[in-house]
Amino acid sequence: MTIDTKFEHSPLLYLKKASGLLSNPVSAAEGRDMIIRTLDNRELYKNYEILLKHLVRKAGLYPYLNTEFKNHDLEDIISIEANKPNLNNDIVFHAIQTRVFNELLSGKNVVLSAPTSMGKSEIISNILTPERYRTVVLIVPTIALIDETRKKLVVMLGEQYRIIHHNSQSHDEHEPAIFILTQERFNQRKDLEKIDLFIIDEFYKLGFKYDKDGVLKYDERAISLNISLSQLLKRSKQWFFIGPNITSVKGLFSLVGDFTFICSNFRTVSVDVKEYNIPATDTDRKKEVLLEILNECKDEKTIVYCRSPNAANKLAQFLMSGASFEASYNDEFIDWLSKNYDPRWNYCQSLKHGIVLHHGVLPRALQHFSVDIFNRSRRHNLLICTSTIIEGVNTKAKNVIIYENYNGLESIDKFTHNNIKGRAGRMYKHFVGKVYCLQAQPEEDDSDELVVPIGDDGSNCPLNLLGSIDIDHLSSGALSSWEDFKKTTIIPIEIIRNNSSFEVEKIESLLIEINSVRVMDFSLYKKLNFFGKPTTEALYFIMVQFIAARKNVLTRNGFSVTSKNDKDPVLSICGKFRAYIAAESVDDYLTQQMNWKYNKLIESQNDKQEIDEQMSGVIDDELKIISNVYGFSFPNFLSLFSDILFHLNFKEKTGLKFDYGPLINDMEFQKLTAGYAAIHEMGIPHQTLEKIRKELININESSVEELSEAINEKYHSIVSLNRVDRYFIHAAML
């Protein structure tokens, strides 16, 4: 929507129209949108300040009443004070924030579906007090969101609560605490029996997805979140669900009874949407239009959404090849990237040209830096990113360009498309954002309707989910299915519950394979019972089973699992894993892999540009493997393997002992101790942490708090740290 030309020379007529729309609940959103646009064109309405102020108040936009107008009358003051969540607070809520706050304050359970710009985090930070909620659990979908939320709550509530964001941190039930965890981390904790309030952010992720034929897509993360929901409902006094663009919720009432569902389209910024309807395959036309838009918005903060990190890299390379983005930026951060990664890396080259990349492959520290430099640098007005745009990235972008309607290989639905569009504009910064859709918008569908699987009839719930939720949350049909399964399965139920992300069929298959080795090849079975690092034979067997259980994970992250030229792919994968296991640090591993790849490229070709591009790809590929495979999927699988091995040893009285714990931790914590791994998640890169570790001696490396305190106290005096290292530390430690 834009201000209609017939109103341009009649501000009074425009305000009268807006007032009429605001008076009708059906059209109030349109009236509010008109009022926000007047704030973006204040000069036109300078003669109608009192009327405009009245309409801002009528629209429920009390924060703007507080910040955009100087002369407040009694009615203004009453409205402002009535919408402050706490006495003497500088925060002023808008109408929907106040409604949600009051519902929670009265002890009700609330499901809130509202736009991204609605200000949900302000509700959380203002509702929480130790007197009201002593133990709070906040479930967020990603580690990136853990850190974004941690930073906000440390500033707002750090003196009142202990903020627990990593499972290496213990909990004293007598101490007020806020847990910020992914669903997987919550499910691992055994110290949260009594909870006063739990919050699920992005609650729409509870729902299962289906392919075009109606077949369930197996989603281990949705399963984990439903398990968390079941456990939290049994342990918590009150709950609050937050997310965007959901119009109905099915299956929740049967679990919890009464709750308040607030579905609001209340926005604090307006958005203009322009559609180009370019066919997905017409890349030349899309690039042409993209250049036109970027030229039009060259002095404004603009986000371009792409389907994948590879697509983002290619688009950045295309823009760098033109005249609009010259390599004019060079500073000590570029030098740091060149030294610690490679000067040929596309992330580094893009920054030189004023282009910022942001995607899930990047280490946490660089993701933070990308957002920071985009928000504050006048030379970096373009951010090219992937679905990370809707996973905890808060920017000052005025414009969003949706370059393609895909997330990876899959088309995005209307829900996700709306979520991306919601990133345009920023309260107090840009009253009106702009969205450019290069392809046609997705058709209307039911993606805005959430069905909570464990509260539905349970017929579509995998057995590993049914076995891991509270029995009171099973429907009669689901309970019958679970009881029938228990009568015939060879898997101990505790193994299913401890490894709930794995389908029971895969757990059973792995148990059979390991037991077969015990029976047929006991010498190999003994080698599986290792301490420290596996032998070549043990690693090979483990890898065969890992491929069988997580083939899609490996192929998605660049591993070839099929034979080529009579070469055994398992040997190749084992070699790569062995190199990582043997490496002293992530930095050492990266250097080894890059040197190996560079030597192979030099042997096979002489084209420097091709070599440079491939070397850039090597860094991205390895970072993705480190994060997704070494750091998550493989240690997760080793935990399952270990549980089965322990079960067989106990059942068959083999007398064998083993300990996979050190290897699992070494993989999961990316060559760091538990405490340093938590610090790394906060945004300090491996390279900087290695310098710190050499200086901080006689300290408990498993304690996040002790390490944080020591780093904050001593990093200024550590000579080996340069200004870039100190930037990362300061940004992470606040």
Q: Where do the protein language model's features map onto the residues?
A:
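N-terminal helicase ATP-binding lobe
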Residues: 1-734
